[in-house]
């Protein structure tokens, strides 16, 4: 049976497309919506817990609380994504599919010309609506350089869509584990995590703290200069000023990132986000995922395997991402490892606040004890019988490595399956230097203020 959004009382006025055919019903009743209770004084922000049976118009709501949020029709979003074409498909998460589009002033007055990402939430089950609502309420009111910008939304009949700014470099997960474009240099990793930490700090410092609850690499989006922004606020929730009083019966999030006290007792606080941050920091150091089920039992859970080695300088080097090839600040690695150790404490009160995390990460960007010398990019070239070294303008060496013996040594008629496998071209491996990225992206790569 198909689930209908109309079965749910909506907290935000949902628009009806004026181009749709009129129904046979005459004088349809005006839609009443669940919204904020009317109060004698206007609150500084709308909270999920503030909704009651009182009603308020969309205009009153949006003008009072939303910041530069546009309301789109479904047809408008269908047009800008070329009918949600597979050629515009960016990816799919737990809450829906994402498509690329482009908006400008001709679509909506005052709309900035920009590429956008349109997320169409799945309609199966009631939880999807709550997630859509959380994103509209939180991102519609809170603006920060390290939170993804919500351009607008669509709430039309059964459709629930969100329109975000488009982030050119995708998410951290792809760069860290798939190594798109090569392994991320050390300083770039620090910059990304510092930006994400500033985003969490901003959420936690609200009058009523916002608990993100789903901090992980796939939710950290990257701009062209590797500035990071938090996205996907579907699981975010309002915290309490009394941290010890936050308990929930439903544990939500992603395996491997949730804090132990949240899993075992449902105790959800800002310190739960700090634990998740520690997991991602550990992933950044090791380039290993939080949970890798293909490994032996002892090494499947990254925190259990790596945390004991974070405070031992002799063991720490063993777990550092080998693709960094030693091109990192030794002091910076140790400081980051010590911070991860604190964030991953089983005692929530022993974890640092996100303000402390930010203050710890900022000086690491200025450490200069990084090994000199460029990274090496190995390019396999079939048929080359010797190794050539080429000096490039940006001091990045390019090496052509022999991958195939001369045909005279291995005649074709003797090249059986074994030999073909033996001389199969190597997969290329690219690691770009901080120096090269600095030249191409500018000083913003190292600017802690970003």
UniProtKB/Swiss-Prot annotation:
EC number from the UniProt entry: 2.7.11.1
SUPFAM superfamilies: Protein kinase-like (PK-like) (SSF56112)
InterPro entries (alphabetical): Kinase-like_dom_sf (IPR011009), Plant_Ser_Thr_Prot_Kinase (IPR050823), Prot_kinase_dom (IPR000719), Protein_kinase_ATP_BS (IPR017441), Ser/Thr_kinase_AS (IPR008271)
Active site: 214
Post-translational modification Phosphotyrosine, affected residues: 164, 262
PROSITE patterns recorded: PROTEIN_KINASE_ATP, PROTEIN_KINASE_DOM, PROTEIN_KINASE_ST
GO MF term (any one): protein serine/threonine kinase activity
Record's keyword terms, sorted: ATP-binding, Kinase, Nucleotide-binding, Phosphoprotein, Serine/threonine-protein kinase, Transferase
Residues annotated as domain Protein kinase: 84-365
Phosphoserine: residues bearing it: 218
UniProt-annotated binding residues for ATP: 90-98, 119
Catalytic activity: L-seryl-[protein] + ATP = O-phospho-L-seryl-[protein] + ADP + H(+); L-threonyl-[protein] + ATP = O-phospho-L-threonyl-[protein] + ADP + H(+)
Residues with the Phosphothreonine modification: 73, 254
Family: Belongs to the protein kinase superfamily. Ser/Thr protein kinase family.
Name of the protein this chain belongs to: Putative receptor-like protein kinase At1g72540
Organism: Arabidopsis thaliana (Mouse-ear cress)
């Amino acid at each position: 049976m198909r689930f209908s959004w109309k079965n749910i009382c909506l907290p935000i006025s949902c628009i009806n497309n004026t181009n749709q055919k009129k129904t046979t019903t005459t004088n349809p009743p005006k839609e009443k919506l669940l919204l904020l209770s009317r109060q004698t004084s206007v609150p500084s922000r709308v909270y999920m817990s503030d909704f009651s049976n009182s009603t308020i118009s969309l205009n009153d709501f949006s003008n009072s609380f939303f910041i530069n949020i546009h309301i789109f029709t479904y047809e408008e979003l269908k047009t800008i994504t070329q009918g949600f074409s597979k050629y515009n498909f960016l990816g799919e998460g737990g809450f829906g599919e994402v498509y690329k589009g482009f908006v400008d002033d001709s679509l909506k007055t005052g709309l900035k010309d920009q590429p956008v990402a349109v997320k169409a939430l799945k309609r199966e089950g009631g939880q999807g609506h709550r997630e859509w609502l959380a994103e509209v309420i939180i991102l519609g009111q809170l603006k920060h350089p390290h939170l993804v910008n919500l351009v607008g939304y669509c709430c039309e009949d059964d459709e629930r869509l969100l329109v975000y700014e488009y982030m050119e470099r995708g998410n951290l997960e792809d760069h860290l584990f798939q190594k798109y474009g090569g392994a991320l240099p050390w300083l770039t990793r620090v910059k990304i995590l510092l930006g994400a930490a500033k985003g969490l700090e901003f959420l936690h410092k609200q009058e009523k703290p916002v608990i993100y609850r789903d901090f992980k690499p796939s939710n950290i989006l990257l701009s062209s200069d590797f500035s990071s922004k938090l996205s996907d606020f579907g699981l975010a929730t309002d915290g309490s000023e009394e941290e010890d009083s936050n308990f929930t019966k439903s544990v939500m999030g992603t395996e491997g990132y949730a804090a132990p006290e949240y899993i075992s007792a449902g105790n959800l606080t800002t310190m739960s986000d700090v634990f998740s941050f520690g997991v991602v920091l550990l992933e950044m150091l090791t380039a290993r995922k939080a949970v890798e089920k293909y490994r032996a039992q002892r090494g499947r859970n990254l925190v259990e395997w790596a945390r004991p080695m974070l405070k031992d300088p002799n063991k720490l080097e063993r777990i550092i991402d080998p693709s960094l090839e030693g091109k990192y600040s030794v002091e910076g690695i140790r400081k980051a490892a010590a911070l991860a150790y604190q964030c991953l404490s089983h005692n929530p009160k022993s974890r640092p606040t996100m303000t402390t995390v930010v203050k710890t990460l900022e000086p690491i960007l200025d450490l200069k004890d990084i090994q000199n010398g460029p990274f090496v990019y190995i390019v396999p070239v079939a048929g080359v019988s010797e190794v050539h070294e080429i000096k490039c303008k940006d001091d990045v060496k390019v090496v052509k490595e022999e991958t195939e013996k001369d045909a005279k040594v291995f005649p074709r008629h003797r090249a059986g399956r074994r030999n073909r496998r033996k001389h199969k071209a190597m997969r290329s491996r690219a690691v770009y230097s901080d120096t090269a990225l600095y030249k191409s992206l500018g000083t913003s790569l190292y600017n802690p203020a970003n």
